[in-house]
């Protein structure tokens, strides 16, 4: 119930419009706060330890300290896991009725700012998306809005987060439509637009008019189209590597039960990687700024491997190593207790991919009239990786165009993003955010039918008003139970309430009046075995397949040890399906 709702007399649609504006402002402030905290921490630590980043051995320890602080905060203060923010927002929509715990309105900002501020090799985008989603969800719950409005407001918060941190309102809307709320209707666009615009205005007001990736672009030339095709294919290959390597590393490290041993291993590994490859420090956006403006990234005095940058052919090799190792540094940061996302690393890897392709082509064409604009390829590569890793080509195209002012590169952005998306899709059906959710059968899709089945839970449709009998009860006892029941199915249990089968009224109709056999016939003489069982925690999609295979109208619900729970029926499921479909599709 809402504690205080001064606009409760308004229609829910009007309440939603007002709240979307408020959510946008609040999330915009949260995005500014996160960026400011990260910047202050990084500058303060740099001043405290002095010198250039990679020139100090202290930076071997700094990222690990940040990871430890974030881990202790999550373990002992909020006592919750808050990593993988975008994935958790998706889970909130599909499995938790769009409800997110109140502490997520601030905890992700606190933990991620420490993680990244100390040099953790992750992005700030996913934590702020989860923060925004939590703000939208809790505002809606506080105001007593419906599930549908709560879901839209959750999306408004996520969209505002992207818009606020990148100053890209259109990209924020597209992010929600492509990645987060697959089944949102077009009439929900106005709240999304209001929230993204208000968040962007807040960001511009407090942080100035500069965009995150200001760059010097070269006018697009049609003769370079074949090279953008090559870039698209390369980005697709990098996307597949990014998704598969990340998930496999997380699974392998996740098997370690001792969190402190896990932290030590990840902290040492991350420290060594950053010491050898300084661009892996933090989000890496400073290095991207250098590449986007066509400048050479100076590594002298920063790393023992600086000599690799002195030979022309060593430069693309060095950056290729950075590209490959960014996935490791990101995963080590998250697995070791840090809080951050894959959004920023995706942009980083995409930029490096674009640079490697452009620099390699320029070296191959050395001495010819052909010249590949490296800064253009850096920018377009960012879109290519986003399209592949996130499976969101529209978001990739418009985000890169908005944050760079690179609308002149629309054609190569579209071309590269489409090819990267298509290449990745051939091998990986799901994005890095949705793969694990899809494997558990919890992913909402654009298919309304599948979305409703995902939202339905077996626990919502279980019927428990069936009179049970024991397997060794007599016919007389069975007739007594039948006379007191309004059902025509009677579950049969053993002595410890494990389901054995069922008796139908039709099975005993002819024997009900044969009183002379009341003590000689028993329940097991009439019992039928169930063709299939339904488990309490089973996905509704699986349940419907069992109904289809068996042609049954009712199926028993049991726990994993076959303890009887109840029955589910087609009629109850269809009724719940209609009700849920109305909620999902209403405007």
For each predicted feature, which ranges?
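Alpha-helical transmembrane segments and immediately membrane-proximal extracytoplasmic
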Residues: 1-455, 459-465, 469-490, 494-500, ...
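Phosphate-coordinating loops and pocket residues in cytosolic domains that bind phosphorylated ligands
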Residues: 191, 463, 510-514, 528, ...
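Structural signal for short hydrophobic segments within the conserved structured cores
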Residues: 465-469, 525, 530-533
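Nucleotide-binding motor/catalytic cores of P-loop/tubulin-like NTPases across gene-expression machines
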Residues: 505, 520-523
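Ca2+-coordinating acidic residues in Ca2+-binding motifs
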Residues: 507, 525, 569-572
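Glycine-rich acetyl-CoA-binding "A-motif" of GNAT/NAT acetyltransferases
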Residues: 499-502, 563-567
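The conserved cystathionine-beta-synthase
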Residues: 469-486, 493, 512-515, 519, ...
């Amino acid at each position: 119930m809402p504690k205080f709702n001064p606009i409760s007399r308004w229609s829910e649609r009007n309440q939603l419009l007002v709240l979307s504006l408020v959510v946008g402002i609040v999330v915009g402030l949260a995005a500014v706060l996160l960026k400011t905290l990260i910047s202050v921490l990084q500058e303060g630590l740099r001043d405290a330890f002095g010198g250039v980043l990679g020139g100090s051995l202290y930076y071997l320890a700094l990222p690990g300290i940040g990871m430890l602080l974030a881990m202790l905060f999550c373990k002992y203060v909020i006592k919750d896991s808050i990593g993988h923010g975008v994935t958790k927002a998706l889970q909130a929509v599909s499995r938790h009725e769009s409800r997110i715990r109140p502490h997520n309105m601030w905890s992700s900002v606190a933990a991620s700012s420490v993680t990244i501020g100390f040099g953790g090799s992750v992005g700030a985008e996913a934590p702020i998306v989860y923060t925004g989603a939590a703000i939208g969800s809790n505002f809606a719950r506080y105001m007593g809005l419906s599930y549908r409005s709560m879901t839209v407001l959750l999306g408004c918060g996520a969209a505002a987060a992207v818009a606020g941190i990148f100053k890209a309102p259109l990209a924020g809307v597209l992010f929600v439509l492509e990645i987060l709320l697959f089944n949102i209707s077009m009439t929900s666009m106005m709240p999304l637009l209001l929230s993204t615009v208000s968040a962007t205005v807040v960001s511009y007001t407090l942080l100035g008019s500069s965009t995150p990736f200001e760059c010097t672009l070269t006018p697009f030339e049609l003769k370079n189209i074949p090279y953008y095709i090559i870039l698209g294919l390369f980005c697709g290959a990098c996307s597949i590597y990014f998704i598969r390597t990340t998930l496999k590393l997380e699974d392998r490290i996740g098997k370690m039960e001792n969190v402190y041993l896990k932290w030590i291993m990840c902290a040492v590994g991350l420290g060594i990687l950053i010491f050898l490859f300084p661009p892996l420090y933090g989000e890496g956006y400073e290095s991207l700024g250098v590449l986007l403006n066509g400048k050479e990234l100076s590594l002298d005095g920063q790393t023992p491997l600086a000599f690799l940058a002195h030979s022309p052919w060593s430069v693309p090799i060095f950056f290729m190593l950075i590209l490959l190792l960014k996935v490791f540094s990101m995963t080590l940061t998250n697995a070791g207790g840090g809080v951050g996302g894959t959004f920023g690393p995706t942009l980083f890897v995409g930029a490096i991919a674009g640079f490697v392709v452009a620099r390699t082509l320029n070296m191959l064409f050395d001495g010819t009239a052909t010249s590949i604009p490296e800064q253009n390829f850096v920018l377009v590569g960012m879109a290519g990786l986003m399209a592949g890793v996130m499976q969101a080509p529209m978001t990739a195209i418009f985000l890169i165009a908005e944050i760079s002012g690179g609308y002149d590169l629309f054609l190569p952005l579209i071309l590269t993003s489409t090819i990267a998306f298509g290449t990745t899709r051939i091998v990986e059906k799901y994005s890095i955010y949705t793969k694990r959710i899809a494997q558990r059968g919890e992913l909402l899709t654009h298919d309304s039918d599948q979305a409703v089945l995902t939202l339905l839970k077996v626990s919502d449709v279980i019927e428990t008003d069936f009179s049970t009998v024991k397997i060794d009860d007599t016919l007389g006892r069975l007739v007594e139970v039948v006379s007191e029941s309004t059902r025509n199915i009677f579950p049969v249990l053993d002595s410890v309430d494990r389901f054995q089968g069922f008796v139908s009224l039709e099975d005993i109709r002819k024997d009900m009046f044969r009183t002379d056999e009341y003590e000689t016939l028993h329940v097991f003489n009439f019992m039928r075995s169930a063709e299939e069982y339904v488990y309490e925690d089973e996905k509704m999609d699986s349940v419907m397949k069992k109904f289809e295979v068996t042609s049954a109208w009712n199926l028993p619900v049991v726990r994993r040890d076959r303890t009887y729970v109840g029955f589910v029926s087609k009629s109850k499921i269809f009724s719940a399906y209609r009700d849920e479909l109305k909620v999902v599709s209403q405007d």
